[in-house]
């Protein structure tokens, strides 16, 4: 058995040929004996073993019977082990190790083989202190360049080789892991509970619908166009929120630090600043802004109503905008980059490819700042709701998305190549074309948009003028796939400077320039492509971290179009009486076009008419199409559908003006429809509420009951970032029995509960209660209205949907969302 054990030991350690020799095979016993200094520290038996090295009582490893159990393996890994035989060896055995390894001065080969083991073990075991260069080389040669942990090596002579290997592999792996410090991930998400409340709430119930109308209205130059943040900040909000939640991705830690900061900063935005407010909303949607703003006078959307009427002009009211847009020198300069961004593949809208085929998105252009249409309504909304969203911020994903943080930040998409843009639709979008605009648009600034992952990434600078433009006849790299520029084979002359930013191959393939932020990495979870703001969704097809705008032209010559339904539910609950619940639901439908479409229209002055059909419109009332851009067929017999077609000359003129005013925009949002949904009282509210106050001179008891209502939604989806905010007066001195835990703002005297999400999967099927008792110094308290805020993605309350009619266009993305506007409950 001794020989067998010896053989196994040699195999396990990868002993050299010398060990394999029969002489060395017999020597292991003595080897185990020779390192008497090594064995002595471990146990007296070890000494006996060394002294009686030749005794038959010793086992093949040179240790007496029962020695295995006596060995303290933990000591091998510790400095003591180093001090022990092997650790001490550096002093005397340095040379002897080499000697013993090759041949020991002692005649017995057993000692040699044992020394070999010692040498191997020592370098690995005491690699920090006791390593000998010669020993290391020898070990590498014998072991095959495999470093063994000190403990496994020492163990091997005394234990079976199999055990040694196991220990070795595990310890080696474990030790480096332990030794490697992992950077601490800190998620910064300052939540100013008080700041975001006002922005979170929609317009007053009576003015909610009017507000939408007013928002829709714009000056013709900016008709329906409210600056929409082009940057895919939306993705960053996701990240930001997940990190703030305290779940930053563990690895790699290096990437984490960057992400958390961005998440943290936006939260502290004041409502006064549009961007700040937007950031706050993104990361702090759950956070509540000043209660006063909510309950105090709210800017009435009605104030904007005047503009609404002006804005909604009949087509008969012709304006210079109606003229077919021609590229002006300025537009040519600016547009070419955008055009380059635009798929060059599509010579004309005429050849309809599969509508969904438009997947390779790509509105891009030097215009990093997407300025969808600047809408007065948006501004009004901002003022009214105090939930202001900057164009850049609008691109940010909805609060929920932020929370998803995604859950983790998706790896930057691969550099967008025209091949990728043309050949494949956006990865994430449901249509498949939903990939973000950035990827497909070479024109987008080369600057990495990854920073955009921060709550409010700065817009990438426009293409530097120094960059040479390709001659009109010279196609750029990937030109074929560029979305909106005419195909190379197209009869129409190539756009001026067709490549713009994409001119350089590096800008196209560079991970830093386009791939990081603009690569088409839109994922299904990237619902963040649309930002929800105060009951209004903004399409953010350019996802800095998520990917390029889905609005890029596909290889099938269809123009990509994205649509978003955004609905706001306003409700007022009085006590526990369902009959006293007042509900008002408003919505809007927005179409988004890639910036490069302006060049496409310039090259194709007579594009195919864009016609679409709204499905499940029977629940809609007071439908208000954009009078300057939409025409409706009122003779339809089907009451459940409504068909609309776009006034293309007006649309082209409008998009041209927007491109001139905001050359850095990568896409343009155009409000098409405003509508109000027929409500059925409390049954139409996704979250039913009941509040009960008990006010006494010395204390106040508050109870809030809520219930998730799936019947109100076309598809049951979770309510995200649910917040309950209640002001408490009477000089609160102490909180008692607060369940679940809540945040108390002593300065503003209000309490805030935050629930990440409520759905059927929640405890008790989404039914719950919030309890709190307040000790008062100046009671009794006066009951105040409860303010609730939430958002939801993937469904609408109206159940409306949209489909294209005819050829030439394809939906790259259809977004559906709803959120709480003025959602109140009183005692």
UniProtKB/Swiss-Prot annotation:
Biased composition, class Low complexity, residue ranges: 335-345, 436-455, 481-491
Single Gene Ontology MF annotation: phospholipid binding
Localization of this protein: Membrane, Clathrin-coated pit
Superkingdom as given in the UniProt entry: Eukaryota
Comp. bias intervals (Basic and acidic residues): 16-32, 40-53, 319-333, 377-392
Region listing for Necessary and sufficient to mediate interaction with CANX, in residue ranges: 648-827
Domain annotation MHD: ranges: 558-826
Start and end residues of each stretch annotated as Interaction with DPF motifs-containing proteins: 560-566, 592-594, 666-669, 812-817
Spans annotated as Disordered: 1-116, 143-199, 223-278, 315-505
Listed Polar residues bias regions: 265-276
Tissue and organ distribution: Specifically expressed in brain. Also detected at lower levels in spleen and adipose tissue.
Pfam family, one: muHD
Annotated membrane topology: Peripheral membrane protein
Phosphothreonine: residues carrying this PTM: 180, 182, 247, 259, 324, 328, 335, 409
Phosphoserine PTM sites in chain numbering: 78, 104-105, 107, 149, 151, 156, 169, 236, 265, 287, 289, 300, 316, 319, 371, 398, 485
GO biological process: clathrin coat assembly; clathrin-dependent endocytosis; energy homeostasis; positive regulation of feeding behavior; positive regulation of receptor-mediated endocytosis; response to dietary excess; response to starvation; synaptic vesicle endocytosis
Residue ranges with Pro residues bias: 245-260, 346-369, 456-474
InterPro entries cross-referenced by the UniProt entry: AP2_Mu_C_sf, MHD, Muniscin_C, SGIP1_MHD
Any one GO cellular component localisation term in the record: plasma membrane
Sorted UniProt keywords: Coated pit, Endocytosis, Membrane, Phosphoprotein
Complex formation: Interacts with proteins essential or regulating the formation of functional clathrin-coated pits. Interacts with CANX. Interacts with AP2A1. Interacts with EPS15. Interacts with SH3GL3. Interacts with AMPH. Interacts with ITSN1 (via SH3 domains). Interacts with and REPS1.
Biological role: May function in clathrin-mediated endocytosis. Has both a membrane binding/tubulating activity and the ability to recruit proteins essential to the formation of functional clathrin-coated pits. Has a preference for membranes enriched in phosphatidylserine and phosphoinositides and is required for the endocytosis of the transferrin receptor. May also bind tubulin. May play a role in the regulation of energy homeostasis.
Comment field (misc): Brain-specific depletion by RNAi leads to body weight reduction due to reduction of food intake without concomitant reduction in metabolic rate.
Name under which the protein is recorded: SH3-containing GRB2-like protein 3-interacting protein 1
Organism: Psammomys obesus (Fat sand rat)
């Amino acid at each position: 058995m001794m020989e067998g054990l010896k053989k196994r030991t040699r195999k396990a350690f990868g002993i050299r040929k010398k060990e394999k020799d029969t002489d060395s095979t017999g020597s292991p016993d003595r080897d185990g004996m020779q390192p008497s200094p090594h064995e002595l520290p471990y146990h007296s038996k070890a000494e006996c073993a060394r002294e009686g090295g030749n005794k038959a009582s010793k086992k093949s490893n040179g240790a007496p019977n029962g020695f295995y159990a006596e060995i303290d393996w933990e000591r091998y890994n510790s400095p003591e082990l180093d001090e022990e035989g092997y650790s001490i060896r550096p002093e005397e055995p340095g040379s002897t190790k080499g000697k013993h390894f090759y041949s020991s001065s002692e005649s017995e080969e057993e000692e040699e083989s044992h020394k070999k083991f010692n040498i191997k073990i020592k370098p690995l075991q005491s690699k920090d202190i006791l390593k000998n260069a010669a020993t290391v080389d020898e070990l590498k040669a014998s072991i095959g360049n495999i470093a063994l942990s000190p403990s496994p090596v020492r163990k091997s002579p005394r234990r079976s080789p199999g055990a040694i290997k196991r220990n070795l592999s595990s310890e080696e792996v474990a030790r480096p892991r332990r030794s490697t410090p992992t950077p601490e991930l800190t998620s910064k998400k300052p939540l100013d509970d008080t700041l975001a409340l006002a922005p979170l709430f929609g317009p007053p119930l009576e003015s909610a619908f009017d507000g939408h109308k007013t928002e829709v209205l714009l000056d013709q130059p900016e008709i329906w166009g409210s600056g929409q943040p082009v940057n895919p900040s939306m993705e960053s909000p996701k990240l930001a929120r997940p990190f703030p939640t305290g779940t930053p991705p563990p690895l790699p830690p290096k990437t984490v630090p960057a992400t958390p900061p961005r998440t943290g900063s936006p939260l502290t935005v004041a409502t006064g600043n549009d961007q700040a407010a937007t950031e706050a909303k993104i990361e702090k949607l759950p956070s509540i802004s000043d209660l006063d703003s909510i309950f105090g006078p709210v800017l009435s959307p009605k104030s904007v109503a005047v503009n609404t009427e002006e804005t909604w002009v009949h087509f008969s009211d012709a304006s210079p905008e109606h003229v077919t847009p021609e590229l002006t020198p300025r537009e040519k300069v600016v547009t070419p980059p955008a055009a380059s961004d635009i798929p060059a593949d599509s010579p004309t809208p005429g050849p309809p490819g599969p509508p969904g085929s438009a997947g390779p998105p790509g509105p891009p252009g030097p215009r990093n700042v997407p300025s969808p249409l600047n809408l007065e309504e948006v501004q009004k909304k901002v003022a009214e709701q105090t939930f202001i969203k900057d164009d850049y911020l609008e691109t940010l994903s909805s609060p929920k998305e932020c929370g998803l943080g995604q859950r983790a930040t998706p790896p930057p998409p691969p550099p967008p190549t025209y091949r990728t843009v043309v050949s494949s639709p956006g990865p994430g979008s449901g249509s498949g074309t939903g990939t973000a605009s950035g990827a497909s648009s070479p024109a987008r600034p080369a600057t990495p948009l990854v920073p955009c992952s921060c709550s409010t990434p700065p817009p990438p600078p426009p293409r530097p003028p120094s960059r040479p433009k390709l001659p009109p006849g010279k196609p750029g790299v990937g030109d074929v796939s560029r979305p909106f520029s005419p195909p190379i084979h197209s009869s129409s002359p190539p756009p001026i400077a067709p490549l713009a930013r994409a001119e350089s191959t590096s800008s196209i393939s560079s991970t830093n320039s386009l791939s990081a932020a603009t690569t088409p990495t839109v994922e299904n979870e990237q619902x963040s492509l649309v930002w929800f703001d105060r009951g209004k969704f903004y399409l953010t097809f350019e996802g800095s971290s998520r990917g390029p705008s889905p609005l890029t032209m596909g290889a099938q010559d269809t123009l990509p179009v994205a649509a978003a339904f955004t609905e706001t539910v306003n409700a007022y609950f009085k006590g526990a009486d369902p009959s006293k619940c007042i509900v008002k639901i408003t919505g809007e439908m927005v179409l988004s076009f890639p910036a490069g479409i302006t060049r496409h229209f310039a090259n194709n002055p007579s594009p195919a008419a864009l016609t679409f059909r709204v499905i499940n419109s029977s629940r809609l009332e007071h439908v208000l199409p954009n009078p300057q851009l939409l025409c409706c067929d009122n003779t339809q017999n089907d009451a459940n559908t409504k068909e609309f077609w776009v006034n293309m000359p007006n649309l082209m003129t409008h998009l041209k003006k927007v491109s001139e005013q905001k050359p850095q925009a990568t896409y343009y949002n155009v409000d098409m429809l405003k509508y109000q949904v027929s409500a059925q009282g409390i049954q139409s509210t996704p979250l039913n509420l009941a509040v009960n106050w008990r006010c006494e001179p010395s204390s106040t008891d508050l109870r809030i009951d809520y219930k998730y209502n799936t019947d109100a939604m076309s598809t049951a989806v979770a309510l995200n970032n649910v917040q309950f905010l209640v002001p408490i007066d009477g000089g609160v001195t102490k909180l008692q029995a607060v369940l679940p835990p809540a945040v108390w703002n002593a300065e503003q005297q209000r309490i805030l509960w935050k629930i990440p999400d409520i759905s059927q999967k929640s405890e008790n099927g989404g039914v719950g209660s919030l309890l709190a008792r307040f000790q008062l110094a100046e009671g009794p308290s006066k009951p105040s209205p409860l303010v609730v805020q939430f958002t939801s993605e993937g469904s609408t309350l109206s159940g409306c949907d949209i489909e294209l009619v005819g050829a030439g266009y394809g939906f790259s993305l259809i977004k559906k969302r709803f959120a709480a506007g003025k959602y109140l409950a009183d005692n």
